[in-house]
Regions:
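Pan-zinc metallopeptidase signature
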Residues: 1-22, 26-31
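Acidic helix-start/capping segments at beta-turn-to-alpha-helix junctions
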Residues: 57-64
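Active-site scaffold of zinc-dependent metalloenzymes
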Residues: 65-107, 121
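Alpha-helical scaffolds flanking conserved acidic
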Residues: 107-111, 133
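Active-site recognition of the HExxH zinc-binding catalytic motif
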Residues: 112-125
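Post-HExxH zinc-binding segment in Zn-dependent metallohydrolases
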Residues: 130-153
Length: 153
């Protein structure tokens, strides 16, 4: 049975275009990109994406947010409900976690980053607001569910 997230009847965001999750980033690490593409295929079968959300994979080690801080992943939540959101994930530091952990654990950290930002996406869809409350737990549950369906990320 597919455990699809049920959205509220009245969403804050406007699904004015085709929904879905799109992965962009040909310059990212091949291992990371392939793992995120496989994870995204599974996500599309298990969850709903009523507003299109592109995921940009950056070849840099870290990203600079709108506020000037650095992060490994970000979610852009537009102020208007009819503007498309997006997620950015830095993949340039794949060699660093790969040196200290095995391949699966290193890739799982990127999948967790994507799941974390997707929880923010669903918060934005529902309410237009974003909070960190419960996000880590929900993201971990998403990655754990995916881990039950695959041998390696």
């Amino acid at each position: 049975m597919c455990n699809v997230i049920r959205l509220k009847h009245m969403m804050w965001a406007t699904p004015y275009r085709t929904g879905g999750l799109r992965i962009r980033g040909h310059r990212a690490s091949t291992d990371v990109r392939d793992a995120i593409v496989r994870f995204s295929r599974w996500l599309r079968t298990a969850y709903t994406f009523p507003v299109r959300c592109p995921v940009y994979l950056s070849p840099h080690a870290e990203l600079t947010t709108m506020h000037g801080t650095t992060a490994s992943a970000t979610f852009f939540a537009p102020w208007q409900p009819n503007v498309e959101p997006y997620i950015r994930i830095a993949t340039g530091d794949y060699r660093r976690p790969r040196a200290t952990r095995d391949r699966d654990d290193a890739l799982a950290s990127y999948l967790h980053s994507l799941a974390h930002e997707l929880v923010h996406y669903w918060q934005w869809i529902d309410t237009g607001n974003i909070t960190e409350r419960g996000v880590i737990v929900r993201a971990t549950k998403i990655v754990d569910r995916y881990a039950l369906t695959t041998d390696h990320p």
